[in-house]
């Protein structure tokens, strides 16, 4: 609570919060002054009509009201000027408070006999408005409220204490006044504290939303570039539209549709050519590179290939290690797609040939091209990558594998489309791989017409480079040469356009500098000229938060009812939880206790009254017990189980709006009833001895005593208790405006009926008694309890009605800003579907450190390759399955189900890298802090291997469920390996996150040489898993391509059934 009572404004938000607070308090201040002015205007004719008096019969009342009308009209004019209000906030507030005090003492000491109960309600009005409607800080408001209370008590105590006729019952009345003022101060401070907290929360939500919106506007542009760089425009639009629809509908990752499949973004294209290219000799070269050199080398090479692809109207599909493949004829059909791919292949070979000649490094390019049809699109839910599938794609892959280094290897289908543009020669049978040999179709090698000329030109340069190479590592020499190509870095094009670093600062730095302070005589509109565009937007938002906006047309709110225009948002607002309800109830209980104390001080305390208060007291205790029962959790847990449900009661009240409304309404009605309960035990009419005609006042003074059943002094205090009843309605800040209007109107009618009709004779009797010694004299208008009460009832009614609407507006505004901020944050989902969460901030956004390529080396990463070899046999292209589309639909289900495992907390450390056909690649240990592994022992640093094993088993379980529903018998073949890797992002046109290293290569070999239903690991990984409690058994020594003879192990688990791996 200490924060709630801190002086305004907080230093860290000095400029914007000062302006915002002034604007938010201007409206209630204007309403306060307007109510006083209108009451002064209406009071004169209304009182004359109601009392049947001439206005001139009460000159003191007429003079006081006219002076108040003139003074407060002047103050209204000053407060309505925004410039003056911002410049003279505290002096103007102090002047209004002093004017109200002067008016109160004017009413007190004019118009007749001064009594202890006189003008208590008006001073209560002053106290409450100081807190709720004047733009003062909490400390200033509390000081004004306490001074107002003490001044009334001291002035009347001193004035009446010296008058013998007034000393009777003086102390109980002053004590009752003190209770009233104390309750008024507490209620006012409570109301101000909650409103300031709500205002501060709304202010921060608005600025956070603006900050987020500005940042997201930039990030959306970046995401648009990113999506369009990895996906064709039509597919990016389609996927983005569905994501936004899913977010708006609040659905899960799997949208509800007529079938139970995930959305499939795959289409068939005919008349395309597919190019596969592999850098021969790169694996050996990469083993000599540092992480930075490796990522730079790959980015330069593939960046150059991307430039060549763009020149020849080809689309890069994916990078697989050092393998590059692209397609021509996507997404738009091109008649020259075969020629485009062949030209690109030749240019790639020339680029590598120049590199080899210039550096002397023994690398080459092997290219394969085939023409046909493909299925293209995106599968899975995470780490989207545009891909192509078909038998023709498989054939193009084998064309590269069975090709010749430095040559472009094409099929007969591609040759037919070249139409003689290039000379070719038959490829020898010895170059064919088993797949091509089994196919039996002739293949061809394209003859490069420029190869001989380039070899002659490059001879001298090659000799020079070879001399330099004697003093430099081949990898370093190659890196130096590749830098001259100047390939663009990933996301470089995003860092120069609307950089978030320059546009997303939440508050301008100059707002906090001592040299730049707010001249409060200037309005926000005047400041617009001094501030830049970004700062001016903050003031625009602040002006939108002004409570006067509730009376202007809005696209979010209904002008009259303040309901949200969107029915769904209105429903969400009304159903939102309200944990603060218990505090509303507690403060209302304080009002009830104040009423009880006052009644005990000024009434004769009949038994019926005590019984009524006892029952009500028990009902309040029951309500508070229910509201605060969550704080009894520890106590209840130690008790019997039959009481464990008690803490859930407070949660039920906080989350059930219907129950809250019922309890709130019942609580307010109880306070209303108990405020006048003492009057309900009195007769509605009686013969008052003081009102008998022609009776000597001396006789009354000597022979008649007030009966105990007629406590006249309680009449004005019952009226004051009614005012507290009005205040109790303002304590429920989140209660709807229409319900507050209904309750306030009900209480206004009931109170006026009691004091002006059924029990008006009591007020007349009290006045007659006070003035019995002054025949012919009549009290002033505000000296009669019934008239005084009616006037103050109307004043409090209209004042609280205005505050209720303002509270409703700010509660709804706070809800609206929170919802907008939440929606804007949800829109960032796209980025995490392209890059790992720990990588994206370093490449895009305000956290981007520099223009260097992203690369990171890790000492211990576990890499998984999980393939479904049976899918290759399952895949077929026929009219029945729409040329393979339905087969891919099933693969999409499999990959999507695999992706859904990543959202489970236990697999939060698993990072999906990519999919390669029906092979799933993932890694653990990539989100560890770099360098952390070297500071810990091996067992602890590689503890995430167990997570990867559990993930592999979960993949098998998922596949088993799919088999059950699709009537298939797919089985996983999994390879695991752990060790050092290099991670990075390469490719400017299509940024792609990947990992490289011997660890990755061996993990891939563990999968390709594995056995269905088994997890194959290397000997080192087997030892690490055994230290974690897993059981492995030796498979023996097997031949692994590129690695020679390796001893491998199988993990003792069956991927075809669900369950955890066996642990020894």
Swiss-Prot record:
Tissue distribution: Widely distributed.
Extracellular compartment spans: 685-707
Spans through the membrane: 29-50, 61-80, 94-117, 120-138, 141-162, 170-190, 583-604, 608-630, 661-684, 708-733, 741-761, 788-804
List of residues binding Mg(2+) 1: 278, 322
Region called Disordered, residue ranges: 498-523
Gene Ontology cellular-component terms listed: cytoplasm; dendrite; membrane; plasma membrane; protein-containing complex
Residues annotated as glycosylated: 694, 701
Modified residues (Phosphothreonine): 533
Amino-acid positions noted as binding Mg(2+) 2 in the UniProt annotation, renumbered to this chain: 278-279, 322
Modified residues (Phosphoserine): 517
Catalytic activity of the protein: ATP = 3',5'-cyclic AMP + diphosphate
Residues that bind ATP: 278-283, 320-322, 366, 914, 994-996, 1001-1005, 1041
Membrane topology: Multi-pass membrane protein
Activity regulation comment: Activated by forskolin. Insensitive to calcium/calmodulin. Stimulated by GNAS and by the G-protein beta and gamma subunit complex.
InterPro entries, sorted: A/G_cyclase, A/G_cyclase_CS, AC_N, Adcy, Adcy_conserved_dom, Nucleotide_cyclase
Keyword Plastid: no
GO BP terms in the entry: adenylate cyclase-activating G protein-coupled receptor signaling pathway; adenylate cyclase-modulating G protein-coupled receptor signaling pathway; cAMP biosynthetic process; intracellular signal transduction
Keywords: ATP-binding, cAMP biosynthesis, Cell membrane, Cytoplasm, Glycoprotein, Lyase, Magnesium, Membrane, Metal-binding, Nucleotide-binding, Phosphoprotein, Repeat, Transmembrane, Transmembrane helix
Principal subcellular localisation of the protein: membrane
Co-factor requirement: Mg(2+); Mn(2+)
Entry text on domains: The protein contains two modules with six transmembrane helices each; both are required for catalytic activity. Isolated N-terminal or C-terminal modules have no catalytic activity, but when they are brought together, enzyme activity is restored. The active site is at the interface of the two modules.
Its job: Catalyzes the formation of the signaling molecule cAMP in response to G-protein signaling.
Protein name: Adenylate cyclase type 4
Organism field: Rattus norvegicus
Gene from which this protein is expressed: Adcy4
């Amino acid at each position: 609570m200490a924060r709630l009572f801190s002086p305004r404004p907080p230093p860290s938000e000095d400029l914007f919060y000062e302006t915002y607070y002034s604007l938010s308090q201007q409206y209630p201040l204007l309403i306060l002054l307007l109510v006083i002015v209108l009451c002064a205007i209406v009071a004169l004719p209304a009182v004359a009509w109601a009392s049947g008096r001439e206005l001139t019969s009460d000159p003191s009342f007429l003079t006081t009201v006219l002076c108040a009308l003139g003074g407060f009209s002047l103050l209204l004019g000053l407060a309505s000027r925004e410039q003056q209000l911002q410049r003279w906030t505290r002096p103007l507030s102090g002047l209004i408070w002093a004017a109200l005090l002067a008016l109160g003492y004017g009413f007190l000491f004019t118009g007749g006999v001064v009594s202890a109960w006189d003008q208590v309600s008006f001073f209560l009005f002053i106290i409450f408005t100081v807190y709720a409607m004047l733009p003062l800080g909490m400390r200033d408001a509390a000081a004004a409220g306490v001074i107002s209370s003490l001044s009334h008590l001291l002035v009347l105590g001193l004035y009446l204490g010296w008058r013998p006729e007034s000393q009777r019952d003086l102390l109980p009345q002053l004590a009752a006044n003190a209770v009233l003022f104390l309750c008024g101060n507490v209620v006012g401070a409570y109301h101000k504290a909650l409103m300031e907290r709500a205002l501060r929360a709304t202010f921060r939500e608005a600025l956070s939303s603006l900050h987020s919106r500005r940042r997201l506007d930039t990030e959306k542009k970046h995401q648009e570039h990113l999506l369009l760089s990895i996906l064709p425009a039509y597919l990016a639009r389609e996927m983005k539209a569905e994501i936004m629809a899913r977010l708006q509908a609040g659905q899960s990752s799997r949208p509800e549709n007529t079938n139970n499949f995930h959305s499939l973004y795959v289409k068939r294209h005919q008349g395309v050519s597919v190019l596969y290219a592999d850098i021969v000799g790169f694996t050996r070269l990469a083993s000599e590179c540092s992480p930075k050199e490796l990522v730079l080398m790959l980015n330069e090479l593939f960046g150059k290939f991307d430039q060549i692809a763009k020149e020849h109207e080809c689309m890069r599909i994916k990078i697989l290690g050092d393998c590059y493949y692209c397609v021509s004829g996507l997404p738009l059909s091109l008649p020259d797609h075969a020629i485009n791919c062949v030209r690109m292949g030749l240019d790639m070979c020339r680029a590598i040939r120049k590199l080899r000649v210039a550096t002397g490094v023994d690398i080459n390019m092997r290219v394969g091209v085939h023409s046909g049809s493909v299925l293209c699109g995106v599968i899975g839910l995470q780490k989207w990558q545009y891909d192509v599938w078909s038998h023709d794609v498989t054939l193009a892959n084998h064309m590269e594998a069975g090709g010749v280094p430095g040559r472009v290897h094409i099929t007969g289908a591609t040759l037919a489309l070249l139409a003689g543009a290039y000379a070719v020669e038959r490829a020898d049978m010895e170059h064919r791989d088993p797949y091509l040999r089994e196919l039996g179709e002739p293949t061809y090698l394209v003859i490069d017409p420029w190869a001989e000329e380039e070899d002659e030109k490059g001879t001298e340069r090659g000799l020079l480079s070879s001399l330099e190479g004697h003093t430099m590592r081949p990898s370093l020499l190659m890196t130096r040469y590749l830098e001259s190509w100047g390939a663009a870095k990933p996301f470089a094009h995003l860092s120069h356009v609307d950089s978030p670093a320059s546009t997303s600062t939440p508050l301008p730095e100059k707002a906090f500098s001592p040299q730049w302070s707010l001249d409060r005589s200037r309005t926000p509109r005047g400041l617009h000229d001094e501030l830049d565009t970004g700062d001016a937007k903050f003031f625009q938002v602040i002006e939108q938060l002004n409570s006067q906006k509730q009376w202007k047309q809005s696209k979010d709110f209904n002008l009259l009812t303040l309901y949200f225009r969107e029915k769904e948002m209105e429903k969400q607002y009304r159903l939102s939880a309200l944990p603060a309800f218990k505090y509303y109830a507690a403060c209302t209980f304080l009002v009830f206790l104040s009423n009880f104390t006052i009644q005990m001080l000024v009434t004769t305390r009949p038994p019926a009254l005590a019984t009524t208060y006892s029952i009500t007291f028990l009902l309040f205790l029951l309500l508070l017990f229910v509201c605060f029962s969550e704080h009894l959790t520890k106590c209840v847990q130690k008790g019997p189980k039959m009481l464990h449900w008690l803490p859930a009661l407070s949660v039920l009240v906080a989350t059930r709006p219907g129950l809250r409304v019922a309890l709130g309404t019942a609580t307010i009605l109880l306070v209303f009833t108990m405020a006048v309960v003492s009057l309900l035990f009195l007769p509605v009419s009686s013969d008052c001895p003081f009102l008998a005609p022609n009776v000597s006042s001396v006789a009354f003074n000597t022979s008649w005593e007030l009966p105990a059943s007629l406590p006249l002094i309680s009449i004005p205090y019952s009226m004051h208790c009614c005012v507290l009843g009005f205040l109790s309605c303002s304590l429920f800040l989140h209660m709807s405006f229409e319900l507050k209007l209904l309750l306030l109107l009900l209480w206004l009618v009931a109170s006026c009926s009691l004091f002006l009709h059924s029990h008006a004779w009591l007020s007349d009797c009290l006045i007659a008694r006070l003035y019995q010694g002054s025949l012919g004299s009549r009290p002033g208008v505000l000296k009669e309890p019934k008239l005084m009460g009616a006037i103050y009832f109307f004043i409090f009614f209209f004042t609280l009605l205005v505050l209720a609407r303002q509270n409703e507006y700010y509660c709804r505004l706070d809800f609206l800003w929170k919802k907008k901020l939440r929606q804007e944050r949800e829109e960032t989902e796209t980025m995490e579907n392209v890059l790992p969460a720990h990588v994206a901030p370093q490449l895009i956004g305000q956290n981007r450190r520099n223009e260097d390529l992203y690369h990171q080396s890790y000492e211990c990463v576990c890499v998984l390759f999980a393939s479904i070899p049976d899918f290759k046999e399952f895949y077929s292209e026929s009219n029945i399955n729409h040329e393979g589309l339905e087969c891919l639909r099933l693969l999409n289900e499999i990959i999507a189900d695999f992706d859904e495992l990543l959202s489970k907390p236990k697999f939060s450390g698993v990072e999906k890298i990519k999919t390669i056909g029906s092979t799933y690649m993932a890694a653990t240990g990539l989100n560890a802090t770099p360098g952390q592994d070297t500071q810990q022992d091996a067992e602890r640093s590689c503890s995430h291997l167990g997570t990867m094993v559990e993930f592999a088993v979960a993949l098998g379980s998922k596949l088993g469920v799919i088999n059950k529903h699709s009537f298939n018998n797919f089985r996983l073949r999994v390879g695991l390996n752990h060790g050092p890797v290099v991670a990075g992002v390469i490719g400017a046109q299509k940024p792609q996150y990947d990992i490289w290293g011997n660890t990755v290569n061996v993990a891939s070999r563990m999968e390709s040489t594995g056995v269905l239903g088994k997890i194959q690991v290397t000997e080192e990984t087997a030892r690490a898993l055994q230290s974690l409690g897993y059981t492995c058994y030796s498979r023996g020594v097997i031949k692994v391509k590129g690695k020679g003879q390796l001893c491998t192990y199988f993990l003792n688990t069956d991927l075809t059934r669900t369950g955890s791996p066996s642990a020894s």
